[in-house]
């Protein structure tokens, strides 16, 4: 009986280690079809809590392969002005970390397929407690976490183990300025995909050298089998297509989020902003898909 139990536990372990996360499955499917991922970023609760879940569903209809949700935080050091303001609006509307996670749970009621990644900072997670935070995320159907201020080290390795127990991915940022040793640790610890920051600076920075980005992406690809997605500075179909030539996916945030800047509580303006966001999604999707047609 003892042997049987051991055999069962070993089989269960093998089964668990074989399970692909939703993020991994999505990239696998895209690769089989010769397609690249379009990953929009929106801030949870921006411009108000009522908008987020409905917008997530609309983003999927308009070509999102995965959705990145920002967790509002009062001191967002890596975020440019556009995303920082979105966070302020969300906090003004009382969107807490737990409420943001609840939005994902609501989205999951009718969408079991599209991966959702949360991007945020350590502090709000530490207030809840790492284990409880990951448990809440897992129950809600979150697939990956990107904590901007959690560097790849012993702490992140421990956190990585917690995430693996819940079949979730830990996403890390790599930048043009990342030192070799740190890059090595990121490629060892990261899973799901690598988020390559295309610019030296903060989100929404302006000058994007697509040829330089492609060169860096190709270099990273010689060191890892993980998909590489590029974010920061992608504003239109042309830049998305140029980036998707070498990368496995493009992440677009500021270019979408900026449409909520001046809407306030005006329902008509919010509707108009959403239409502009979805129109931009169509442009990006079409441009990226031209690569595989």
Language-model segments: which ranges?
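Alpha/beta catalytic cores of nucleotide-metabolism and tRNA/nucleoside-modifying enzymes
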Residues: 218-224, 235-241, 245-293
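Active-site beta->alpha loop and helix N-cap motifs at the rims of alpha/beta catalytic domains
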Residues: 71, 84-150
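Glycine-rich phosphate-binding active-site loops on the catalytic face of alpha/beta enzymes
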Residues: 69-74, 144-146, 151-153, 196-204, ...
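Catalytic cores of alpha/beta
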Residues: 52-57, 178-187, 234-250
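Active-site-adjacent beta->alpha loops and helix N-cap segments on the catalytic face
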Residues: 21-25, 29, 75-83, 95-102, ...
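Alpha-helix-loop-beta-strand connector modules within alpha/beta enzyme cores
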Residues: 82-116, 162-171, 175, 213-226, ...
């Amino acid at each position: 009986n003892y042997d049987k139990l051991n055999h069962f536990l070993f089989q269960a372990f093998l089964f668990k280690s074989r399970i692909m996360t939703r993020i991994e499955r999505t990239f696998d499917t895209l690769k089989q079809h010769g397609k690249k991922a379009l990953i929009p970023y929106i801030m949870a609760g921006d411009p108000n809590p009522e908008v987020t879940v409905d917008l997530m569903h609309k983003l999927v209809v308009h070509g999102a392969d995965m959705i990145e949700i920002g967790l509002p935080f009062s001191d967002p050091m890596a975020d440019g002005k556009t995303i920082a303001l979105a966070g302020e609006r969300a906090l003004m509307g009382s969107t807490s970390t737990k409420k943001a996670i609840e939005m994902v749970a609501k989205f999951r009621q009718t969408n079991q397929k599209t991966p959702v990644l949360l991007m945020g900072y350590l502090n709000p997670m530490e207030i809840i407690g790492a284990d409880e935070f990951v448990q809440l995320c897992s129950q809600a159907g979150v697939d990956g976490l990107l904590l901007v201020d959690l560097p790849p080290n012993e702490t992140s390795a421990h956190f990585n183990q917690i995430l693996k127990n819940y079949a979730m991915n830990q996403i890390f940022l790599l930048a043009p300025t990342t030192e070799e040793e740190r890059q090595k640790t990121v490629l060892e610890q990261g899973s799901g995909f690598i988020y390559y920051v295309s610019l030296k600076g903060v989100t929404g920075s302006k000058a994007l050298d697509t040829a330089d980005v492609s060169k860096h992406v190709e270099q990273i690809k010689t060191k890892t089998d993980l998909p590489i997605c590029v974010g920061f500075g992608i504003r239109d179909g042309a830049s998305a297509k140029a980036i998707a030539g070498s990368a496995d996916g493009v992440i677009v945030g500021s270019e979408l989020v900026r449409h909520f800047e001046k809407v306030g509580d005006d329902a008509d303006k919010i509707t108009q902003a959403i239409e502009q966001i979805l129109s931009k999604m169509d442009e990006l999707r079409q441009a990226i898909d031209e690569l595989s047609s």
